[in-house]
C-alpha cells in the first residue's frame, strides 16, 4: 500500500511517481517549495504541483494522464467557421506575466483559482530562465486569451489557459499544437483528463506509458528558435 511522502525544504528529490496514491488519484507528496530547481525536477519526472490557496504544496502524478500529440488535435467544423471570422493575432512569449495573471482570474461561479501570486512568481522565474513559455491571443491589441507551460525536451507541459472572448483559449491551444509540431515537439502533457480537453481530442493514457514516453522525449532536441518572441499564425 502506497503512503504519502513529506518533503522538506532541503530535499529536492521526489519519490517514484508509481508510489502516488490512488485516492486521491495521483497525490504523491506534500511540502517542499516552488524553487525553480524543484519545479524542473518535478516536471522532468512527470510530477506537477496543484493545491488550494490555504493548503500545503501538493505534488501529483495521476493515472491515467491526459496528453495530446501535436498535429492530432480535434477541431470541429463549427469552431473552424467561428475562428475564421475573427481578426485575432497570436504571439509567443510576448507577455508571460499577463498570461499567468489572466489564468489566475476566477472562472464563472468560482471565488478564485489556485494560481496565487507565489505560483505566478515561481513560473515567471522559470520563464526568465528559458523553461516556461506563453502563447497570447490578441484582439485590437487587447489580450483576450492565452496559455502557459514548460518545455521539457520534446514535451510541452501545459499548465493553464484562460479566455476573455468566446473560444479564445481553444484558439490558443490550436495555435500551440501547430507551433509545437513545426518545432519538433512530440507530446503535450495536459495532466488531468476533463471534458474540455476531451472535446479537443486529448488522449487518456496509463501513467506507466506516459512516464516511458517522457523518459524517451525529455532530452530530445527541438528547433533552436522555438520560443523566440514572434507572431504566429493559425492554420484552419
Curated annotation (Swiss-Prot):
Q: Enzyme group, top EC level?
A: transferase
From the UniProt record, give one GO term of the biological process aspect. protein catabolic process
- Which EC number(s) are documented for this chain? 2.3.2.6
Carries keyword Ion transport?
A: no
Q: Predominant location of this chain?
A: cytoplasm
Keywords from UniProt, A to Z, are:
Acyltransferase, Cytoplasm, Transferase
GO molecular-function terms, A-Z: leucyl-tRNA--protein transferase activity
Decide whether keyword Ribonucleoprotein is in the record.
no
Q: What reaction gets catalysed by this protein?
A: N-terminal L-lysyl-[protein] + L-leucyl-tRNA(Leu) = N-terminal L-leucyl-L-lysyl-[protein] + tRNA(Leu) + H(+); N-terminal L-arginyl-[protein] + L-leucyl-tRNA(Leu) = N-terminal L-leucyl-L-arginyl-[protein] + tRNA(Leu) + H(+); L-phenylalanyl-tRNA(Phe) + an N-terminal L-alpha-aminoacyl-[protein] = an N-terminal L-phenylalanyl-L-alpha-aminoacyl-[protein] + tRNA(Phe)
Localization per record? Cytoplasm
| InterPro entries to which the protein is assigned, alphabetical | Acyl_CoA_acyltransferase, Leu/Phe-tRNA_Trfase, Leu/Phe-tRNA_Trfase_C, Leu/Phe-tRNA_Trfase_N
GO CC annotation, single: cytoplasm
Which family, according to UniProt? Belongs to the L/F-transferase family.
NCBIfam families the UniProt entry points to: aat
Q: What does this protein do?
A: Functions in the N-end rule pathway of protein degradation where it conjugates Leu, Phe and, less efficiently, Met from aminoacyl-tRNAs to the N-termini of proteins containing an N-terminal arginine or lysine.
Give the protein's recorded name. Answer: Leucyl/phenylalanyl-tRNA--protein transferase
- Source organism: Shewanella halifaxensis (strain HAW-EB4)
Amino acid at each position: 500500500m502506497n503512503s504519502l511522502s513529506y518533503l522538506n525544504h532541503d530535499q529536492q528529490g521526489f519519490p517514484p511517481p508509481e508510489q502516488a496514491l490512488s485516492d486521491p488519484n495521483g497525490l504523491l507528496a506534500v511540502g517542499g517549495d516552488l524553487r525553480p530547481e524543484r519545479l524542473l525536477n518535478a516536471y522532468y519526472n512527470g510530477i506537477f504541483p496543484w493545491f488550494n490557496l490555504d493548503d500545503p504544496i501538493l505534488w501529483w502524478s495521476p493515472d491515467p494522464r491526459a496528453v495530446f500529440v501535436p498535429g492530432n488535435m480535434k477541431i470541429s467544423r463549427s469552431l473552424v467557421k467561428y475562428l475564421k471570422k475573427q481578426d485575432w493575432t497570436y504571439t509567443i512569449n510576448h507577455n508571460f506575466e499577463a498570461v499567468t495573471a489572466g489564468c489566475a482570474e476566477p472562472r464563472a461561479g468560482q471565488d478564485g483559482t489556485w494560481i496565487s501570486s507565489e505560483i505566478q512568481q515561481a513560473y515567471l522565474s522559470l520563464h526568465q530562465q528559458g523553461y516556461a513559455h506563453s502563447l497570447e491571443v490578441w484582439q485590437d491589441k487587447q489580450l483576450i486569451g492565452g496559455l502557459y507551460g514548460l518545455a521539457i525536451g520534446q514535451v510541452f507541459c501545459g499548465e493553464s489557459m484562460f479566455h476573455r472572448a468566446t473560444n479564445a483559449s481553444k484558439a490558443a491551444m490550436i495555435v500551440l499544437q501547430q507551433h509545437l509540431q513545426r518545432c519538433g515537439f512530440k507530446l503535450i502533457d495536459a495532466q488531468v483528463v476533463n471534458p474540455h480537453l476531451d472535446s479537443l481530442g486529448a488522449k487518456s493514457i496509463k501513467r506507466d506509458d506516459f512516464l516511458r514516453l517522457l523518459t524517451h522525449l525529455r532530452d530530445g532536441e527541438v528547433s533552436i528558435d522555438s520560443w523566440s518572441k514572434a507572431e504566429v499564425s493559425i492554420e484552419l
